Amino acid sequence: MNIYRLSFVSCLVMAMPCAMAVEFNLNVLDKSMRDRIDISLLKEKGVIAPGEYFVSVAVNNNKISNGQKINWQKKGDKTIPCINDSLVDKFGLKPDIRQSLPQIDRCIDFSSRPEMLFNFDQANQQLNISIPQAWLAWHSENWAPPSTWKEGVAGVLMDYNLFASSYRPQDGSSSTNLNAYGTAGINAGAWRLRSDYQLNKTDSEDNHDQSGGISRTYLFRPLPQLGSKLTLGETDFSSNIFDGFSYTGAALASDDRMLPWELRGYAPQISGIAQTNATVTISQSGRVIYQKKVPPGPFIIDDLNQSVQGTLDVKVTEEDGRVNNFQVSAASTPFLTRQGQVRYKLAAGQPRPSMSHQTENETFFSNEVSWGMLSNTSLYGGLLISDDDYHSAAMGIGQNMLWLGALSFDVTWASSHFDTQQDERGLSYRFNYSKQVDATNSTISLAAYRFSDRHFHSYANYLDHKYNDSDAQDEKQTISLSVGQPITPLNLNLYANLLHQTWWNADASTTANITAGFNVDIGDWRDISISTSFNTTHYEDKDRDNQIYLSISLPFGNGGRVGYDMQNSSHSTIHRMSWNDTLDERNSWGMSAGLQSDRPDNGAQVSGNYQHLSSAGEWDISGTYAASDYSSVSSSWSGSFTATQYGAAFHRRSSTNEPRLMVSTDGVADIPVQGNLDYTNHFGIAVVPLISSYQPSTVAVNMNDLPDGVTVAENVIKETWIEGAIGYKSLASRSGKDVNVIIRNASGQFPPLGADIRQDDSGISVGMVGEEGHAWLSGVAENQLFTVVWGEQSCIIHLPERLEDTTKRLILPCH
């Protein structure tokens, strides 16, 4: 009989999704049970008892708030939520729709807009709101209105990258190198204070060198109401029109990241070939902005921040000390603006040399603006003035040609006054084009052409001439191209990059790279990977440096891969066999052996590497032994530290000034957040890095890997944070024992079937009363109080001070 009664209750619960009210025939139950069952909450979909609840809120299936306190009030025969004005502002309504909703007794009156529907999902504790799409100011799942963005909490942070290496040649001096770089900062409200630092120490038998310090300090804050960002202090001049340089001053600029994805900027892709376990360092004006360890073979770096613009210096340092330097152009895509809108950049200050806090004795002012004149046409221009010695003006047009792609063309005029010469005036012409070819799925990421007169000087070039004339180069012509082409039937991907630069007073240079990779299946061998790459660098009046690379990789065993690769350059040929294996999602290792034609003993060498990813950071170690030549070992560690009033934690490294999310689980440790990469520490704190600014981000608790006896009431967080934010979210969590109880009141009666059991101090629901007072409580602690609620009645149960044998059923009086 009990089984049938439980089945009946299950059917009642399953009936909740019905759109209309349901009347239940209780005559099928025993007469003694009819008065002890509370099913009032099961009659209609979304019905909830009057009172205050902490719930999630979603608009058209997009979650806009977590842990929102809402009061449900009785109105006639219905229970409706009281929505305050601050929550309505997060809906993202158009201004005229928002203004049409009056406020009555601190609750917004929606009676004039009956098309807005409210439904409470009791199972997920979420208020679902349906709003006609035409009433919303936004339509994209990847973008939310500024009214929903969060600035985060106050705190301090430290992002760090640590590198150590030792090189011991067969003959000559051994050397040890230690270096570090990163960012330290403080958040207060929407303000962010940041200091970039880099340190380097090199020791050898005949040389000891130590350098570094704080490369720049600046203060910034996003201004969502203006769609812009204010920056004060030591920073870099970033422009879509003028060349970049370092300066100390102030800047106010529109931030593309506050726009939908299709209107955001472009970041360059950098590719090359490493001959050993090499370190790739990318810097701009002497400041390191990116550093990464790469294995032998072709590498692609495509995760640079899109705010990086101008010429980037790339240094590939091989583990045996050899260095390969080249440059890439990080030009912007066509400067397009939506119709009727204006984007702008204002900057003023004093220029400063690279890696210096001292400024030059001159002041500049710059402004640029882009206006969306028509739906697909933008006009843009700018001015840059420095005292009486330098003046520059630019004007251009950007055109979205739809299926033909997007292009821009601009002309820049500049007048430069040098102390020992007459004024020099000239023009510079620039053309940009980008296109996604849907028919062939080809991508022309950037095609750019620029030509400058002999007497044209950008402001950055003018400063070089004035303060460092011996090294100043006058640009004549630049051509850059980046193309991608997948060939789906062959599982083949082709990439090509080209940069050609000529100078009025220096040798021309050309750098080109072509990479092809595809996967094939041969018989029982699946997922065979084959890739080849050609890289060439040529400086006028110098020999061309060509590099060819071929790699074949086959799966072997459980997660392992065996490979062969060959590198041929103008000076040597390398053959290498390798084995790489992934132990689990946190650990991987590899080893290789090979020959190199231009080294002693034919360059016979063996290498090994190991990588470990933890919640606190990423560790990498590698080593090489080359017969009769050298031995080397290197190690790196990258991570971050974040502290707020709610706690502190070491965690995986955050990226530049992107937000990070601190999650608190009420002191419960080892709760997996965001897959299995981030776990709460001993104090119940975890920090999730790599959150995107101004983009709705979802972070979820892995409910399948919770520790025994742990319960998390809310397992999904979806919020949007502004740049540099330290987000914070507390997830109600319990760690304890699972207890089977029988609840009865002083008269021996049981609470009604379906009565809700809530934790007394937090109000979190921990269970529901079953037949004859039975209930299952999970993750509870000794001596805890719980409130049993049905309708407008309630009583309190108290767990014993000691729970020794949880296999036995406890009888708890409810007072």
UniProtKB/Swiss-Prot annotation:
> Residues of the signal sequence?
1-21
What are the subcellular locations of this protein? Answer: Cell outer membrane
Q: What is this protein called?
A: Uncharacterized outer membrane usher protein YbgQ
Q: Which GO terms describe its cellular component?
A: cell outer membrane
Report the Pfam families cross-referenced here.
Answer: PapC_C, PapC_N, Usher
Task: State which gene encodes it.
Answer: ybgQ
Which PROSITE patterns does the entry link to? FIMBRIAL_USHER (PS01151)
Family per similarity comment:
Belongs to the fimbrial export usher family.
Taxonomic lineage is:
Bacteria, Pseudomonadati, Pseudomonadota, Gammaproteobacteria, Enterobacterales
